[in-house]
């Protein structure tokens, strides 16, 4: 039912201003100086060539229509998926929570791991609506700001 998550992430970075990015059925904001890259299923914004920081939103079709009464069952699947992603990255899930994102019940995880010799945090948030899964990903170095990640999670809107 759930799409496999690819590596991506959220960053700390301080660009002047904000940029609103629109995808199919959603919008979100990024720091104004970040470069936006679009593919068929994903919009990603990166801080810069030498930074590990990035934010991304991917859309995946669900086999069945998500219904709120299925939340507890779906949450267990999401927990397993987050554990698998952490294992693939040789990291660990350091935080998990159910919260509201874009007016929908969502599941958020923080995964800590090493990437290119640096300690990073990757936040994944799964938002389900109808027959679509929205996967919000953000990555930043542990020693740097999580502001871009916070901006992604707080600005994400379904349209």
Give the location of each predicted region:
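Sec-dependent bacterial lipoprotein signal peptides
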Residues: 1-8
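Intrinsically disordered, low-complexity regions enriched in Ser/Pro/Gly/Gln/His and often acidic
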Residues: 3, 25-29, 64
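Bacterial signal peptide processing site
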Residues: 10-13
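Surface-exposed amphipathic alpha-helical segments
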Residues: 34, 132-159
């Amino acid at each position: 039912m759930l799409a496999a998550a690819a590596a991506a992430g959220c960053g700390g970075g301080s660009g002047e201003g904000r940029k609103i990015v629109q995808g199919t059925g959603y919008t979100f904001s990024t720091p104004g100086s970040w470069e936006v890259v679009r593919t068929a299923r994903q919009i990603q914004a990166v801080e810069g060539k030498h930074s590990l920081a990035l934010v991304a939103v991917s859309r995946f079709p669900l086999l069945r229509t998500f219904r709120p009464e299925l939340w507890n069952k779906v949450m267990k699947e999401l927990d397993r998926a987050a554990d698998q992603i952490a294992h693939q990255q040789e990291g660990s899930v350091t935080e998990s929570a159910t919260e509201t994102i874009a007016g929908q019940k969502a599941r958020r995880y923080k995964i800590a791991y090493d990437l290119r010799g640096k300690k990073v945090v990757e936040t994944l948030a799964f938002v389900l609506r109808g027959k679509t899964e929205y996967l919000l990903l953000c990555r930043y170095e542990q020693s740097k700001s999580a502001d871009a990640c916070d901006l992604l999670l707080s600005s994400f809107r379904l349209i």
